[in-house]
Amino acid sequence: MQNCDPIKQKIKSLVKQLNKANYQYYNLSDPDLSDQQYDALIKELINLENHYPQFKLPYSPTLKIGGFVEKKFSTIKHKTPMMSLANVFNIEELKAFYDRIVKKIPTFSLLTELKIDGVAISLKYQKGILVRALTRGNGIWGEDVTKNAQTIKTIPLRLNEDLDLEVRGEIYLSHPDFEKLNAQRKQENKPLFSNPRNAASGTLRQLNSAVVAKRNLSIFVYGIADPYLTKPTQKETLVFLTALGFATNPHHYFVSNFENLLSVIEKYKSIKEQLTYDTDGIVIKINELVFHSLIGATAKAPRWATAYKFATITSQSIIQNIIFQVGRTGVITPVCEIMPVMVDGSLVSKVFLHNYDYICKKDIRIKDHVIVHKAGSVIPEILEVIKSKRTDLQKPTLMIEKCPSCKTILEKQPGGIDYFCLNPNCREQKIQKLIHFVSKNAMDINVLGEQTIITFFDKNLITKPSDLYLLKNHQHILQEISGFGAKKITNILDAIEASKQKGFEDVLFALGIKHIGKKVSQVLAKYFQTIENLQQSTSDTITQIREIGIKIAQSIQQYFSNSCNLEEVTKLKKLGVSFQSTNSQKPTTQNIFTNKKIVLTGTLQKYSRLQIQQILEQMGAIITNSLSLKTNYLIVGINAGSKLTKAQKLQIPIIEEKELQQIIENNQIKS
C-alpha cells in the first residue's frame, strides 16, 4: 500500500504557503510570490486534492475566492459573491476549456476582454447615485472604500439613468501616473512601489481619501452583478455600461470559433506593448448570458469564463558585481552588473537597484543567482533572488562610505533613503550635468555623445554648459584631439549653435534643477514665459500652479539663490541661448489646426511624439489623449491602434503623415 503521509504533509505545506501568499497579496499589497509561482503552486494543490480528496483541508485556498479582510475599514457582505477566474496557461488548456463548453452548448459565441492587472471592486448605485464601493476582500465580505472610490475620476458619482444596480470593475494605475507617483515618493524619501498593481491596491486602502484623490487611479467596468439588469450578451452589456457613463475597456472582440479565438489572442499580444496600463492576460467569456447558468460554476470560479494568462518573460543570470554610481544631483545609485542575458528581446547586462534600502530589502548579493524581467516591459529589474542556490561565496552587500568619483564622505538626510555626494566640484557630477544638458529632451545636441563629453572635460575644454558655446574659440585645440577632423568639428559647432534656438522649456529642463522633469519644465515655461519671471517668483506664486508642489517650488528657490547658478544662467543668455517661451505663442497665421482638438496614434516616421506635439501646439492645436465627438482630427502613423477604428466609427477626419507633412510645409513651420 502506498505511504500517503508525505502526500498529506505536502498538501498541508502548500495550503500554509498559499494562504500566507493570499494574505500578503490581498491584505498587505506586498506579495512574496510572483503570479507564475502562485499559479504553479495552486495548480499543484488542485491536482493533489483531486487525486487525494480525503486529505483536502477545510481551510484550503482552493475553496476561497480571495484573501482575508483587515479591520481598518468596515466589512460588508457582497450581494453576489465576487468570484475569481480559473486560469489557463497554454493553447492545449484553452482548447480543453472550449471543448467542455461545446459538449453542453454546440452553438455559442465568445467575447474576449483584456485582463487588467489591478484591484477588483464592486460599485453599488441607488437611483443612479453611487452609494457604496466594496473591495473583493475574501469574495464574500469586502472592505467599504466608498469615500476613496468617490475620488476616482473615472468612477461616475451619478449615472446617466436613475437605476438601482451593482457593477464590477478593476481599479488600476496607468504607467505615467505610476512613474509620477514613484518620482514623488522618491523626492519625499519614501519607499517606492514595486509595480502599478501594488500602488493601486495600497492607494485604494488608504484611510485618507485626500491621498487617494492625488494619485489618479482609474477604472474599467466589465460587468453587472444584478441578473435582471444584464443584457442578452456580454457585448451588449459593455455597450450598456458605456452608455450609463462607465469607463469600459475598448479592446474586446467577438469570437465565433476556436480558430478565430487563436487569431484574436495574437492580436492582443501585438497591442499589449502599446498599452499605458498593465495587463496579464485575456478574459474569455461565453457571450450569451443565458448560457452562464447552464454551464454553472465551481465553489471558486465560473465555468463559463476563463483567463488566458500571458507568459511573463524572465531570464536567469548571476550577479557579477554591484557598483555605486553618482548622478548629476549627487545621489548615489547602486547598479547590478550581471552576466549578459536576453530578456524580452534585448541583451541585459546592468540592472539599476534604486537605493541601498532596496538591496537590503531584497537581500541582493554579489554572485547571487537571480531572475530578471522587465518592469512594465521596459526597465530591467531583479524579480527574485534564488536563495536556494546560495553558497558561502555570497556575502551581504555593504554600503560605500565615500563618493566613488571624488571620495567625499557621503551624507544621508535624516529620515531619507538616498545617500548623496555634496561636493559641488565632484568630477562625475559635472560630467553627468553636461551629458544631461546635451540630451535629446534637453538641448538635443546629439553629436555630443558621452565619450566626447568626457574627452572635452578631461582636456579642460568644458566644465559647465556655458563652456559648450565657447568651443568655437578653441578649434585649434579640438583639431589636435585624435579622431576629430575638420568635418566632425564643424558638425559639433553647428549643432551647438543651433541649440540656441531651443525653447525655454527645453533650456529649463537642461539646467538640471532638482525635481524639474520634462513635464514640469513645460508647465513652468508656459506659465512664466521667461527665465526672469521664474527667477523673481516666490514659492507661493509657483505653488499656485496646479501641477506644482512645495518641493518643486523650494528647489527652484534654492537653485536661484545660488550665485554660481545665477552666473551660469546670465552667461548662457549673453552667449545667445534663448530663455523665452515659444510653446505658448499664438500662431502668426490661422491654419486648419488653430484651436482644434487633435489626437495622435501610431508612430510617425519623421517626427517623435514630442516633436510633432510641439509643432502642432505651435500651430495653435490643442493636443488631447482620448477620442470623443469633440475631437476635430486624428493624426495616424504606423501601427495605429484602436483609436483609428473608433475615429472611423465617429466619422472624425483622419490625417496621415504625408498629408500632415504637406500642411506643416504650407504653413512654413520649422520641424
Curated annotation (Swiss-Prot):
A molecular function GO annotation: metal ion binding
Cofactor section: Mg(2+); Mn(2+)
GO annotation, biological process: DNA repair; DNA replication
CDD domains in alphabetical order: BRCT_DNA_ligase_like (cd17748), LIGANc (cd00114)
A GO cellular component annotation in the UniProt record: cytosol
Any Pfam family the entry gives: BRCT
Entry binding sites for NAD(+): 35-39, 84-85, 113, 136, 170, 285, 309
Entry-linked InterPro entries: BRCT_dom, BRCT_dom_sf, DisA/LigA_HHH, DNA_ligase, DNA_ligase_AS, DNAligase_adenylation, DNAligase_N, Hlx-hairpin-Hlx_DNA-bd_motif
Sequence similarity: Belongs to the NAD-dependent DNA ligase family. LigA subfamily.
Main function: DNA ligase that catalyzes the formation of phosphodiester linkages between 5'-phosphoryl and 3'-hydroxyl groups in double-stranded DNA using NAD as a coenzyme and as the energy source for the reaction. It is essential for DNA replication and repair of damaged DNA.
Name of the protein in its database record: DNA ligase
